[in-house]
Every structure is written in structure tokens, then in C-alpha cells.
Amino acid sequence: MKLVRFLMKLNNETVSIELKNGTVVHGTITGVDVSMNTHLKTVKMSLKGKNPVTLDHLSLRGNNIRYYILPDSLNLETLLVEDTPRVKPKKPVAGKAVGRGRGRGRGRGRGRGR
């Protein structure tokens, strides 16, 4: 399972997130998208070396996140189970032309080198 798919299941969980600049954000996840952008509510943001700031809502860009600190009470076994079955790729059918080989009869061609 991809990490982002796991994080997308964490709706309404209270987590702490450390950013690459050292800021620690503590809040409740309202959503995570495929770019790992995370949306939080009831947020307490502790900037490095400054007093904490309380916010109603906060959106974090995914590439600014260093790591998530999950609560100990979170049941990882149930979240890590894949609920969608994988689709197996279809095998090519024998006798059908595949690729771009041997198909040189289109257009006027390149001429005779003059």
C-alpha cells in the first residue's frame, strides 16, 4: 500500500506533523490528497523558537512535511489492509501486432538522398 493511500484513511484523527523547517503542527486531519497535501482543523502550530499559534483550519503542502506523529491508540492493522483488489494487467493476445515494427509503407518516404 502506498503511504499516501494510508494517510488518506486518517480522517478525524488527531496527529502531530513536523515540517521541514522545524515547525510542529498538532491538529485533527480533515483530509489528505494524492499529493500528500494535508488539511487540518483545531490546529496548534508551534513555530521553531516562537510561541504556539492556535488556528481553526490549516492546509499544509505535502512536500513541506517531514513526518507524521500518529497517536498510540491508532489501530494500524485495520488501516493497512488494502480494501481495493489489484487489477492484473491483461496479457497480449497472440497473433496481434504489437508495437511499431515493420510499418514503413506510409507517406512519400525520405527520397533517394539528393
Swiss-Prot record:
Similarity-based family: Belongs to the snRNP core protein family.
Renumbered residue ranges of the record's region 8 X 2 AA tandem repeats of G-R: 99-114
Pfam families for the chain: LSM
Phenotype caused by lack of the gene: No visible phenotype. Smd1a and smd2b double mutants are embryo lethal.
Function: Involved in splicing regulation. Facilitates post-transcriptional gene silencing (PTGS) by limiting the degradation of transgene aberrant RNAs by the RNA quality control (RQC) machinery, thus favoring their entry into cytoplasmic siRNA bodies where they can trigger PTGS. Does not participate in the production of small RNAs.
Name the UniProt record assigns to this protein: Small nuclear ribonucleoprotein SmD1a
CDD domains cross-referenced by the UniProt entry: Sm_D1
A GO cellular component entry from the record: plant-type vacuole
Compartment(s) where it occurs, according to its Swiss-Prot or TrEMBL record: Nucleus; Nucleus speckle; Nucleus, Nucleolus
Principal location class: nucleus
Swiss-Prot/TrEMBL keywords: mRNA processing, Nucleus, Repeat, Ribonucleoprotein
Sequence repeat spans: 99-100, 101-102, 103-104, 105-106, 107-108, 109-110, 111-112, 113-114
Keyword Repeat included in the entry's annotation: yes
Miscellaneous comment text of the record: SMD1A and SMD1B have redundant activity, but consistent with their expression level, SMD1B is more important than SMD1A and either one copy of SMD1B or two copies of SMD1A is necessary for the plant to survive.
Positions of the Sm domain: 2-74
InterPro entries, alphabetized: LSm4/Sm_D1/D3, LSM_dom_sf, Sm, Sm_D1, Sm_dom_euk/arc
GO terms of molecular function: RNA binding
Ranges where the record places region Disordered: 87-114
